[in-house]
């Protein structure tokens, strides 16, 4: 529906992603994508539309975090935190290479000014941590197996980051395989 309506310039945050994001990227709907990994399904080749956008330098801004850090960022968003201190990316290229420069970030109000900031650990003198920004989500889209007409949802299987983004977002769009009664879902 997003593709059909022609809406563009979305800022997308996602943990491990797949075909859903690949379609949006391929249709030019995503302005900036903050992610850790995107593949066609499971752990296969990188999504082809995403790969094309990156290799041919289409207008996709990309910021890369490690999988554990992006998942923690989404959880921190559900807790209402402004930033998250981590040690997980220390010494890696993810700490030193920014996909979206500070100059470009300042032109996009929905993006934080920096990818990260090395700050002193307030609990251990002489030690630093990496502070990463926590996203402020406008809308989350989650897929569930069952939902009631009142919005109660049931996820059967892995939840991944769906619960965190549903709590964090101002609005939630739920895609349900089946609409059931309140009695059945409770």
Where are these regions (language model features)?
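Conserved alpha/beta enzyme-core scaffold
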Residues: 1-186
């Amino acid at each position: 529906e997003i593709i059909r309506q022609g809406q563009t310039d979305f800022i997308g945050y996602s943990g491990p992603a797949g075909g859903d994001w690949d379609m949006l990227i391929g249709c030019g709907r995503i302005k900036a994508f903050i992610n850790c990994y995107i593949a066609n399904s499971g752990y296969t080749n990188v999504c082809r539309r995403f790969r094309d956008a990156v290799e041919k330098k289409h207008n996709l801004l990309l910021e890369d975090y490690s999988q554990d850090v992006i998942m923690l960022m989404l959880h921190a968003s559900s807790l209402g935190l402004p930033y998250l201190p981590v040690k997980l990316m220390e010494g890696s290229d993810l700490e030193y290479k920014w996909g979206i420069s500070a100059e470009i970030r300042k032109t996009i109000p929905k993006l934080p000014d920096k990818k990260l900031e090395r700050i002193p650990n307030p609990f251990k003198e002489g030690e630093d941590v990496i502070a990463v920004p926590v996203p402020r989500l406008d809308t989350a889209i989650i897929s569930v197996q069952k939902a009631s007409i009142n919005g109660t949802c049931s996820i059967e299987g892995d939840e991944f980051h769906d619960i965190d983004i549903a709590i964090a977002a101002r609005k939630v769009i739920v895609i349900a395989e089946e609409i059931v009664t309140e009695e059945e879902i409770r």
